[in-house]
Amino acid sequence: KPDGVFLGYMLGGDTLFELRTSLLLAEQERQGGLSNHVSPMTDTRDVSSLLTRAQFTLQTVDMDEIVVHYPSMYELVQDLRDMGESNAVVNRRPYMHRETLLAAAATYQALHGTPEGHVPATFAQIFMIGWKPSPDQKKALRPGSASHSLKDVL
């Protein structure tokens, strides 16, 4: 619909980088190989490109990070399962050995743990908005065409 708005939200960027790096390091050490155990994430540039390809105008894409602290990696993983945020990657190892999981939890605590004994989990939120084109829609002005300086206003 002309001049229709699209509002979107998704997790992306470096979401769960602490968990991702801990799992990769433990798996490399214990099993001699790597498998993705956290779903891949997109970044703001990809979201902007997607909005452009979908022919949205007047786009804005913003990102904010939230850090949530958990008692250990196990509570974080349980929360992710409860949210239905299990790994959706098709070509991955179907399970992780117990010793690898224990090593990942120890690595997580050693690399990212707080003095209080908690582990942080970073969630990078991507917010997006775009408008469908319309003949009456406002157009962005040409750079440098302003009649007043921002310095004068501030």
PLM features: what roles do these ranges have?
Residues 5-73, 83-94:
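Conserved catalytic/acceptor-binding region of the Class I
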Residues 54-57, 71-154:
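C-terminal lobe and adjacent flexible extensions of AdoMet/dcAdoMet transferase-like proteins
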Residues 1-2:
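Helix-to-beta-strand junctions that scaffold the AdoMet/dcAdoMet cofactor pocket
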